[in-house]
């Protein structure tokens, strides 16, 4: 009837008394249940690593990726940097317009990251209104350029609420991995630079090598 099902195929050869191949046997096995189970496992794995609201990698995924990046740096000397990003006045969106609008703000920022990220960079939700970008990058100038570009892209995005355009901005701390860094020291430095941006008035980035 044209219905398709997943199968596994096992093939064996048939030989005569002299050892010559005279044919073959194929054994087909319905593996529908196995396929469904595998899809369920993949979905559960995805749910464990993806933030449901923003559809970005979650904190667990980001922590695993940072470990991978540190290993790559040790083995292959691949440089990278991180952006620590915080949505400005996010509490105000929640308190003034409600949590539904706050969720839309988070989703809007996430879409901006997704639409403008390079294939080899990763942006994820660290928690609350905080995000992290893990960027394959070698120089401070490149890092500053990307940080400011991302800031401007978010600033130029908005959501509509009851006929009003709500502008969203972010503050960013940007830094590049040092030879003596640990994951903790790298994140702490980026977080300190983020705080510097917020203290300086928000909607800006601060870079520190």
Regions picked out by a protein language model, each given a short descriptive name:
Residues 122-125, 166:
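A short pre-motif secondary-structure segment
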Residues 20-31:
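PAS-family sensory domains
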Residues 144, 162, 176-209:
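Catalytic-core segments of nucleotide cyclases and related cyclic-nucleotide turnover enzymes
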Residues 45-46, 59-79, 110-118, 136:
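Short regulatory alpha-helical coupling segments
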Residues 65-97, 113, 124, 143:
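Active-site-proximal structural segments of metal-dependent nucleotidyl cyclase/transferase enzymes
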Residues 9-11, 28:
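Sensory-domain boundary capping and coupling elements
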Residues 44-64, 85-99, 107:
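Conserved nucleotide-binding and Mg2+-coordinating catalytic segments in signaling enzymes
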Residues 101-122, 130, 149, 154:
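Active-site-proximal alpha-helical element of nucleotidyl cyclase-like catalytic domains
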